[in-house]
């Protein structure tokens, strides 16, 4: 492209830059409990850090499309000052995955689904608990685009304790436990990732 006019070269590099995956995507089953709560929580915490320029989103492998946050998880969200409403569940697609620099899942079934449907995105996929365990003692902040590789090198196979159980229709205690785990693990990501501005 060396012979192209400078205005075209600049436009192409800008297009390439803007099309690079740069967001965080949370994936669970219905996209109304774990991933939706994590999405709301991380967005809120990044906003509190001064509007870090990272898109945060969520989707489900069997989404309850169009539904808001589950009522028990919404109660957990409100308890920590989040609105707990305004979410709209969506089905995970290849296009959604392409936009994410980091894909964060909650159970082995989510990894299996991505491996079956969109295996090319496994290199950017980690379990939330797995990421928290691997990054917890990190000496330096890890650039967002390098997180999945770093986590997969340090902890290639998530242990049972690194998965977060689905609280859907399991009552307020299950929702409380899931929300607490998500907040704790997302907190570790907040403290150990070098977030782009």
Model-predicted regions and their roles:
Residues 1-197:
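Short polar/charged helix/loop
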